Amino acid sequence: MAKALHITIFLFLISSNLLAFINSARLLDEIQPQPQLVPTGQIPTVAPTEAEEEDGTDDNPGLATTTTTASAVTVPAGPAEATEPLLEFFMHDVLGGSHPSARVVTGIVAQTEVNGIPFSKASNSIFPVDNGVPLVNSNNINSVINPNTAPLLTGLGGAQTSTVIQNTNGNSNDALSANSLPFVTAGNLPPGAALQHLMFGTITVVDDELTESHELGSAVIGRAQGFYLASSLDGTSQTLSLTVLLHGEHDQHDTLDDAISFFGVHRTASHASQIAVIGGTGKFEHAKGYAIVETLHNQDNQHITDGQDTILHFSVYLTYKA
């Protein structure tokens, strides 16, 4: 009897311990793990896992790139967005007459068979001695430059269509005057010579007035200084290199503060041409853009001078102005 009681008590204790062990294991599974406490002043080193990096990249692949591009790149307004020109003016290119603003520096049209141009054949008035230096003075200049050998000036308006030699006094003595250079047209060229081929390579320097309107006597806002080059064999293109000097504010016409420089090809046979803005000074420093150049024909008051006045209308579009 006593032995059976001991066995029963032993089995009861084993069963109780087993149940307690099973219950404690279930409770441990249900309790969430607590974060590890780090002593003050120590920073734990945590190595990122590859899975986290891949997840961060795959979730939003283009977000970081789009944000960086939008904040770093600033696109200025392009020429297509500019509906109105920032600046407009009219340039008067006056050739010949008593007050020319343009002068040819290269491109003499020579008829050597008639006029005896230097280096074509011997001339005692040009070469006083053998192997001498040619001396051009008021006594023999008309043997070198006369209406048939004058500088060929067709200007920015294109080649002349008439056959009249335009000068002031109607004779070749105009070549002696710096302010009244004559110019020749197609009817006065040597036989077999084409006007366009003789014009090719001619350089003309200019110091032209800029006005607010097309009339030559309108308000002057500045000057255009530079040169243009006959750059096509057919005579329809002029390569322009100009710096436009604008008057200062408050009607200070004796002060030229701001300037814009242009370079490009003006096609005289076209209604309008585009040339590039290559820089500037003053309020136009770092200027970029372009200008539309139009040749105006048969305007009122266009021929109030005794020279040939070619009017160019400039419309300037700037995409950046400091």
Swiss-Prot record:
InterPro entries: Allene_oxi_cyc_Dirigent, Dirigent
Entry keyword annotation includes Signal: yes
Function: Dirigent proteins impart stereoselectivity on the phenoxy radical-coupling reaction, yielding optically active lignans from two molecules of coniferyl alcohol in the biosynthesis of lignans, flavonolignans, and alkaloids and thus plays a central role in plant secondary metabolism.
Record localization: Secreted, Extracellular space, Apoplast
Cellular-component GO terms for this entry: apoplast
Cleaved signal peptide residues: 1-20
Pfam families xrefs: Dirigent (PF03018)
Domain of life assignment: Eukaryota
Keywords, ordered alphabetically: Apoplast, Secreted, Signal
Family per record: Belongs to the plant dirigent protein family.
Protein name: Dirigent protein 9
Self-association state and partner proteins as the record states: Homodimer.
Keyword presence, Amino-acid biosynthesis: no
GO biological process, one term: phenylpropanoid biosynthetic process
